[in-house]
């Protein structure tokens, strides 16, 4: 391993010990914000520090085995130990390279998940509902919280559009590769001839940004409309204009929120989604510039990004970005998404490593 990388790892090890000392300091414990920030940093440094210690141990094993090679009686055993230690060292070196990749500061944030029905009419809305259920199930397994911000229901079930906030550890980093177009092939319940229909929905995943970090939005750039919430009827339908529609005139971005009975709460929710969308649009421009130089596995949430096809007759799901096909569609729709998410995360990391080696 390069001496410059070893030096960086030694510095991170020192910082890990320093942060641990801070966490035992009474003044730090009393400052909840600082304590949380340092706890997060400590957790992030723990993996790389542990891996570095194991790598150093493997180097010691290599050195000890090489010294035993001169002993005729011990040579055979030493050669076997050397082989094992070198293989372990190489494996740990690869792990360390991944752990040292630049971190996206947004990865630890909560996110807004937006699902919109695309082509396919009622079937597209039903599929959007199935997708939301899939992500909700996945969130349950990760112990994340799901809060619906806004929903427009389809006439025969599902959603024309739904926006939810998902909160928990590392939410955005885990879900950010879901942005893009998702296509379904199946026989709709209303199809009497048994023909397979193709419909689609688009998914956008945006980091939920704290209010202090949101882009400044000029009030003069906003058009705010109020209207009566739509619903299925009954006692919970609003009789006042509590629903909010906010249009950001410079970008044309429109956000509606009618989930709360309070107009004030709906407006606050809509503004947080609007801020996230404006920031996401700015990030998208940067991503597109980078994608012109190398492939970009991070989708933009645009329907032209063809992420996956879910083929129900064959029980097959295909991720077109990395040519991955699994015949485990039932499990995927029940929220077992790690089998799809982890391969693309690994591919993304491989691309990052490739980019870094080109710079070197």
From Swiss-Prot:
PTM (free text): Methylated by PrmC. Methylation increases the termination efficiency of RF1.
Xref: Pfam families: PCRF, RF-1
Region annotation (Disordered) ranges: 291-312
Predominant location: cytoplasm
Family annotation (InterPro entries): PCRF, Pep_chain_release_fac_I, Pep_chain_release_fac_I_sf, Prokaryotic/Mito_RF, RF-1
Domain of life: Bacteria
Bias-annotated ranges (Basic and acidic residues): 291-308
Record has NAD as a keyword: no
UniProt-listed Gene3D superfamilies: 3.30.160.20, 3.30.70.1660, 6.10.140.1950
The family this protein is said to belong to: Belongs to the prokaryotic/mitochondrial release factor family.
HAMAP family, per the entry: Rel_fac_1
Name assigned to this protein: Peptide chain release factor 1
Protein's organism: Yersinia pestis
């Amino acid at each position: 391993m390069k001496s410059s990388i070893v030096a960086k790892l030694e510095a991170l090890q020192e910082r890990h010990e320093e942060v641990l000392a801070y966490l035992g300091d009474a003044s730090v414990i009393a400052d909840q914000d600082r304590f949380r920030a340092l706890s997060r940093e400590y957790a992030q440094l723990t993996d790389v520090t542990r891996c570095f210690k194991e790598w150093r141990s493997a180097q010691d094993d290599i050195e000890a085995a090489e010294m035993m090679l001169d002993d005729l009686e011990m040579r055979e055993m030493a050669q076997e130990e050397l082989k094992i230690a070198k293989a372990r060292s190489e494996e740990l070196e690869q792990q360390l390279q991944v752990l040292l990749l630049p971190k996206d500061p947004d990865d630890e944030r909560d996110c807004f998940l937006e699902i919109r029905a695309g082509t396919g009419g009622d079937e597209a809305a039903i599929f959007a509902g199935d997708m939301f259920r899939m992500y909700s199930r996945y969130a349950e397994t990760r112990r994340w919280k799901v809060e619906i911000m806004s929903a427009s229901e389809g006439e025969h079930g599902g959603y024309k559009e739904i926006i939810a906030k998902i909160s928990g550890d590392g939410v955005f980093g885990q879900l950010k590769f879901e942005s893009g177009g998702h296509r379904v092939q199946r026989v709709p319940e209303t199809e009497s001839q048994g023909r397979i229909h193709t419909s689609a929905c688009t998914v956008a995943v945006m980091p939920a940004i704290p209010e202090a970090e949101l882009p400044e939005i000029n009030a003069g750039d906003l058009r705010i409309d109020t209207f009566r919430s739509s619903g299925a009827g009954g006692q919970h339908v609003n009789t006042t204009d509590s629903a909010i529609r906010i249009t950001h005139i410079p970008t044309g971005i429109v956000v509606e929120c009618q989930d709360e009975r309070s107009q004030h709460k709906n407006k606050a929710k809509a503004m947080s989604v609007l801020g996230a969308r404006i920031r996401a649009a700015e990030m998208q421009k940067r991503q597109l510039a980078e994608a012109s130089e190398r492939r970009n596995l991070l989708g933009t949430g645009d329907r032209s990004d063809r992420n996956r096809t879910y083929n129900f007759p064959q029980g097959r799901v295909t991720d077109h970005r990395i040519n991955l096909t699994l015949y485990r569609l039932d499990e995927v729709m029940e929220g077992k998404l790690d089998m799809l998410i982890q391969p693309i995360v690994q591919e993304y990391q491989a691309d990052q490593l490739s980019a870094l080696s080109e710079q070197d």
